[in-house]
C-alpha cells in the first residue's frame, strides 16, 4: 500500500455507509497506516449528524462531521430543522454546513424543494462562523445565482467532488470557493477533462476527498475492490501531483493546510 510522509486530510467520506461502518475498525486502521490524520464524515440528513457523533466518540482526534440536507433529501427538510441544526453547530465536532446544494441530474427532490432547502442553508450559514460543504450536479445556473447572492456573507465555501466544466470552475473561483477533487480525476473517460482544469485551481483553494465508499481511484493497484475508503486518498494525491508535475509531499502539505484552515481545525 502507498504511503504519505505528509499528513493527509479527507474532506469528504461517507463513513455512515454500511460498507464502511460495518468494517469501521479496519477502515480506520488502514487510514492511519496511510497517514490520514483528519476525516470529515459527510452528513446528508440531520439524522446523519447524530449518527456520526457515535463514530466520532470512538476517534475524536481523527473524525469530524457536517450538518445539513443533501439535495436528494431536500423534500424532508422543514423550517423547524433550523433550530436543531443551530444546536448541533455549537459542538466542536461539527465543522461545516452541508452537504447541501442542488442536484438536477436525478431530482429525488423537486427543484422547488431543493432551491428552498439550499436557500435556508445559505441563510443559516450567514448567521454562524462555519463554512459550507456544497454539492452541485447539472444545476450550474441556479446554483451560481444563489451563490452570488450569499457567498460574500458566509465564512467559506467548498464545492465538493468537482466534476464540471471550465465555466463553472471560473465562476466558483471568482466567488472565492475552494474546490474538492475526488478519484473522478483518475477516470480516463469521465475525468480526463479535470487534468486541464485542475491547473486553474490556485494552490490555496485545492482540497481532496475520497467520497468513499464511492469513486474508487482508477490508479488503485488492486482491481475489482468493492468499495473505496479514506486510506485511498493517497492515490488521488498521486494523480494530482503527476498531472501538475509537483512534488507530492509539498502538494500534500499545501492541501492539508488548506483543509485545516477551511474547517478551522
List the predicted regions and their residue ranges.
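Mid-domain alpha/beta scaffold segments of enzyme catalytic cores
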Residues: 1-265
Amino acid at each position: 500500500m502507498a504511503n504519505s510522509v505528509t499528513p493527509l486530510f479527507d474532506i469528504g467520506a461517507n463513513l455512515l455507509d454500511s460498507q464502511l461502518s460495518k468494517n469501521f475498525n479496519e477502515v480506520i486502521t488502514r487510514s492511519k497506516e496511510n497517514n490520514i490524520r483528519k476525516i470529515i464524515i459527510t452528513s446528508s440528513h440531520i439524522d446523519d449528524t447524530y449518527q456520526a457523533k457515535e463514530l466520532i466518540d470512538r476517534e475524536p482526534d481523527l473524525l469530524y462531521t457536517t450538518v445539513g440536507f443533501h439535495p436528494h433529501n431536500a423534500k424532508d427538510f422543514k423550517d423547524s430543522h433550523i433550530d436543531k441544526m443551530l444546536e448541533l453547530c455549537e459542538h466542536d465536532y461539527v465543522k461545516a454546513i452541508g452537504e447541501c446544494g442542488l442536484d438536477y441530474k436525478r431530482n429525488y427532490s423537486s427543484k422547488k424543494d431543493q432551491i428552498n432547502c439550499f436557500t435556508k442553508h445559505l441563510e443559516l450559514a450567514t448567521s454562524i462562523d462555519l463554512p459550507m460543504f456544497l454539492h452541485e450536479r447539472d444545476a450550474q445556473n441556479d446554483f451560481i445565482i444563489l451563490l452570488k447572492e450569499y457567498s460574500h456573507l458566509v465564512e467559506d465555501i467548498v464545492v465538493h467532488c468537482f466534476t464540471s466544466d471550465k465555466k463553472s470552475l471560473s465562476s466558483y473561483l471568482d466567488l472565492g470557493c475552494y474546490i474538492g477533487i475526488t478519484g473522478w480525476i483518475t477516470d480516463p473517460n469521465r475525468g480526463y477533462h479535470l487534468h486541464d482544469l485542475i491547473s486553474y485551481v490556485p494552490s490555496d483553494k485545492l482540497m481532496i476527498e475520497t467520497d468513499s465508499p464511492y469513486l474508487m481511484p482508477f490508479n488503485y493497484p488492486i482491481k475489482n475492490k468493492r468499495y473505496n475508503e479514506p486510506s485511498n486518498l493517497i492515490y488521488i494525491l498521486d494523480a494530482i501531483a503527476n498531472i501538475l508535475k509537483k512534488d507530492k509531499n509539498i502538494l500534500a502539505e499545501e492541501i492539508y493546510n488548506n483543509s485545516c484552515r477551511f474547517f478551522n481545525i
